[in-house]
Amino acid sequence: MVGDFLGANSATPLENPTIITNIIELFSMMILPVSCIFVFGRMAYDKYEESKANNSVYTLSTKNCNRANKVWMGKEGRTIFVAMSILFVIGLGVCFWSESLGNHAVAQAGVTETLGNMEGKEVRFGVAQSALFTTVTTSFTTGTVNNMHDTLTPLGGLVPLMHMMLNVVFGGAGVGLMNMLIYAIIAVFICGLMIGRTPEYLGKKIEGKEMKLAALCIIIHPLLILGFSALAVSIPEGVNGITNPGFHGLSQVLYEFASSAANNGSGFEGLVDNTLFWNMSCGIVMFLARYLPIIIQLGIAGSL
């Protein structure tokens, strides 16, 4: 693990001594990205519904109060929030279930795993808090960790890798939202073609120019991850950093560039990545994956 003076990030008891501090860190990671969704919903809500809610906000009617709350979050905000929440809950469930089953390789060595896969985890957190922290830190792209991701089970390690590759499960402050809007534009365009209507999103027509930019924006993220991963495993400078000769070695490389592209910062440690090649390649991926989508999305906004 990387980070902080001791190099243990949120696993060190000096920074994160109890479950309470762990929960505070989790909440701190989630509040800004979720707030961005609420702000978007507020900005995109129906003016007519807002007017009705404002006229009834001072009454004692529960129905009117509920209506005001719905308008405050906005229909678009609710839809995006629910979609992201479903992906988050599924990932959390899979990670916790896989980690609670334990590591079969450790079990075959004769070690009893009544607490689940505790390799690389802090005893004070256990499997539950570690799985939650792992899911949150890779969903909200903060990069902080309270356990060793490299020691996760195969399915447990798939969840953070998937969340960073999708980069739409809440994401960083505004990043997950802007990527989800690209998926929304593509979905609206496809649905419009299926029913024979001109695609529109938030009252704006979606045409060929916007779709080309949206498709380019979607392709950038996997292209950078897979392209640089292929480069790393094809040249000596990259191969020399892989310490696991099996499939997990390839997973370490994919995770490294997925984490860089998602601006996360966590990693499957064991990869000898403090070299010129890894530092330069990860820096390039980090720069391109962050600014190219922003530039393209500004282009989409300007053409609508």
Predicted regions and their residues:
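Membrane-proximal intracellular helices of multi-pass ion channels
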Residues: M1-L304
